[in-house]
Amino acid sequence: MTDAPGFPLFPHPHLLGIKGLSPADIELLLERADAAVAISRRPEKKLATLRGRTQINLFFEASTRTQSSFELAGKRLGADVMNMSVASSSTKKGETLLDTAMTLNAMRPDILVVRHSAAGAAALLAQKVGCSVVNAGDGAHEHPTQALLDALTIRRKKGSIAGLVVAICGDVLHSRVARSNILLLNALGARVRVIAPSTLLPSGIGQMGVEPFTKMGEGLAGADVVMMLRLQRERMAGTFVPSVREYFRFFGLDAEKLKAAKEDALVMHPGPMNRGVEIASEVADGPQSVIQEQVEMGVAVRMAVMEALLDPRRNGDGA
């Protein structure tokens, strides 16, 4: 994977979303990530690929899993990684997102990893800074590296994504993970279903190329992959479900409901999980679960993305 000999040049300076990526772009990142998995599994994991490069993780929303994954990915590539704690930063004193970005830009980082509660925040920063920007989640808009790691997990287990039936279940309305996965899975030829109470399905969801269901049994029937989503209560302005108990009864994935899917169906969850709300422990920890594999694939995907964005050929420095 060092300097990725043999891989075509990734044609984009930033990763702001799955929207705008071609199937070939997606496949390129997945192939790079496959190579990163092998590196992450060997005793000596550290590369010098990004030695001398600076990565700043700028997280305005808390995320232990994603921030740690990006940090580890950068360190495995040899980058100097700085985690900016927003809780102790100037943003708490009234500094705007753009002010913060311009301050960081003056430090001349090579890559900025951004998570923010506002949709479009990463795209806005990409217009204002002189480095590559990776969207680590912007409001309910997109979370591209999550979709890529989910695709890598599926592909390594199933061989191909084309033709698979993937059921995305839960709070689709508020989920950036759902949006990015729908875009990616459709691009690679999967048949995508979404399952949720009608209150948690976006209006016009069918126009995104998915088949909507409001009953778990119908939506899970014959599914190859079941992707569960948590209730995004922090993004809910009103009451979308009667109660947690009622929600689990109808939309929580337990062993009985899972029987509707194929026997070898994969069970996925982007985390963090709410056991007993959207998924039962017997399923989350069961033989069909690939949730821990998703975490492993996350580091590999983020290594691949950052290496692709900082490819020396982009500046004419490489072959």
Swiss-Prot record:
Keyword check for Transmembrane: no
Binding site residues for L-aspartate: 93, 176, 230
Listed PROSITE patterns: CARBAMOYLTRANSFERASE
Binding site for carbamoyl phosphate: 65-66, 115, 143, 146, 271-272
Keyword annotations from UniProtKB, A to Z: Pyrimidine biosynthesis, Transferase
Database matches in Gene3D superfamilies: Aspartate/ornithine carbamoyltransferase (3.40.50.1370)
Annotated pathway: Pyrimidine metabolism; UMP biosynthesis via de novo pathway; (S)-dihydroorotate from bicarbonate: step 2/3
Enzyme category, top tier: transferase
Gene Ontology CC: one annotated term: cytosol
EC number: 2.1.3.2
Reaction catalysis annotation: carbamoyl phosphate + L-aspartate = N-carbamoyl-L-aspartate + phosphate + H(+)
GO molecular function, one term: aspartate carbamoyltransferase activity
UniProt record, GO biological process: 'de novo' pyrimidine nucleobase biosynthetic process; 'de novo' UMP biosynthetic process; amino acid metabolic process
Subunit text: Heterododecamer (2C3:3R2) of six catalytic PyrB chains organized as two trimers (C3), and six regulatory PyrI chains organized as three dimers (R2).
Entries under HAMAP family matching the protein: Asp_carb_tr
Family: Belongs to the aspartate/ornithine carbamoyltransferase superfamily. ATCase family.
Protein name per UniProt: Aspartate carbamoyltransferase catalytic subunit
Organism: Chelativorans sp. (strain BNC1)
Annotated gene: pyrB
